[in-house]
A protein has these predicted regions:
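Active-site SXXK
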Residues: 16, 30-48, 171, 307
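Solvent-exposed coil/turn segments that connect beta secondary-structure elements
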Residues: 13-15, 23-26, 59-61, 70-72, ...
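Conserved catalytic neighborhood of penicillin-recognizing serine enzymes
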Residues: 61-96, 154-184
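Soluble periplasmic/extracytoplasmic beta-strand elements of cell-envelope proteins
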Residues: 7-11, 19-21, 37, 55-57, ...
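Beta-lactamase-like hydrolase cores
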Residues: 1-27, 49, 90, 96-106, ...
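A small/polar active-site loop signature that marks catalytic segments
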Residues: 99-252, 256
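Short, well-structured active-site flanking segments
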Residues: 45-62, 139-143, 250-255
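Small-residue-rich helix-loop
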Residues: 19-21, 190-351
């Protein structure tokens, strides 16, 4: 079969009754369905209206620069991607900084110290690499936010991100891995945990516990779902999806989910596989080699259902993934149809 013994659960969105389940408590790879947890903890712990700022200035002391960061997840590592999406890019900030250093030091790039706060280690590494290629090798020194504030002089270049709710919407809609990782770490820190994968694991577990769900089968190695060592169960994902849907605070998560045949990572799904379900499915997609997952909501005639499908034992390769996606689409097509079948099978009925 296309789905090769998947883990599945179908929950009545009105009553919370489990309508169908298969391997619902079996540990499976979530792939990017993991981002549902990242989105939920971001809404819970971060101010959705706030923005991130990054400001770069000449230092008050000679031969110093100051970068006042705020762990902005939105700054793109790629300039071309940034231009397409109207985002600031690390190369843009780095280039403008380099020009200002030359101007203030009569063309010299030697003996410069950069004091910085709240930058991701990956961003620091990328800045160093960008500058090193251009002959600029400053001493980079991590300091507190207060210290950068005290040492900042003439402003050079900066950026302000959109509100966090817009960043989260993009993250879920397009399954952006880097943003998911960074938002989850920010959420972990806001919840009082460490700014690390371990902190993320703790904040995900706390979310489950809050809804009375046993987190013992959750294995969190990252927040994006890229790690093949992540593990969830279909029930563990389905129950929070049911609970979150009832809480107006989490409406943003629901609205950010791609719509089948219409938007985001589901824009090309259902169009040929289950045309009757186009516009009726809102869900988070997931794909790894040998794994295809989907979790979210499907509208039927008189109610909405919560569903989770974790097929993590399919054959490797693009063809198998495409077949698995089509099989999941057809299943949801049958649920979206006027009468929900008494038994959900993996094999589509032939007309």
């Amino acid at each position: 079969p296309s789905l090769s013994n998947p883990a599945m659960v179908l929950i009545d969105g009105t009553s919370g009754e489990v309508v169908y389940e298969k391997n619902a408590f079996s540990q499976r790879k979530p792939a990017s369905v993991m981002k549902v947890f990242a989105g939920a903890v971001a809404i819970k712990h971060l101010d959705m209206q706030s923005r991130f700022t990054t400001n770069i200035s000449l230092g008050v002391n000679e031969k110093t620069l100051v970068i006042q960061g705020s762990n902005d997840p939105w700054i793109s590592l790629s300039h071309s991607v940034a231009e397409k999406m109207d985002r600031a890019s690390l190369p843009y900030l780095a280039f403008n900084t380099l020009s200002a250093v030359k101007k203030s030091n009569k063309g010299s790039l030697k003996g410069i110290t950069i004091l910085y706060s709240k930058l991701y280690s990956q961003d620091v590494s990328n800045l160093k690499a960008f500058w090193a290629k251009r002959g600029f090798k400053p001493v980079m020194k991590a300091v507190s936010s207060d210290e950068t504030l005290l040492n900042a002089g003439e402003f050079i270049v900066g950026d302000e991100s959109p509100e966090i709710f817009k960043i989260l919407d993009y993250t879920i809609m397009w399954s952006e891995n880097n943003l998911s990782e960074r938002l989850a770490r920010l959420s972990a820190r806001a919840a009082g945990n460490s700014f690390s994968d371990k902190g993320v694991a703790q904040v995900f577990e706390a979310l489950l516990v809050e809804y009375g769900i046993d987190p013992s089968k959750l294995v969190t190695k990252d927040a994006s779902g890229l790690s093949k060592e992540n593990r969830i169960t279909a029930s563990m994902m389905g129950q929070p999806l049911y609970q979150l849907r009832k809480d107006p605070k989490y409406s943003l998560l629901y609205e950010s989910l791609p719509v089948g045949g219409v938007s985001g990572t589901l824009r090309s799904r259902f169009l040929t596989t289950a045309p009757g379900a186009v516009g009726l499915v809102r869900a988070k997609t997931g794909t790894l080699n040998g794994t295809v997952t989907l979790a979210g909501y499907v509208e039927s005639t008189d109610r909405e259902y919560v569903f989770v499908t974790l097929a993590d034992d399919i054959s490797r390769g693009a063809k198998s993934s495409a077949k698995a996606r089509a099989a999941i689409d057809r299943l949801l097509g049958r649920i979206a149809a006027p009468n929900i079948p008494a038994v959900i099978s993996e094999t589509p009925t032939t007309p």
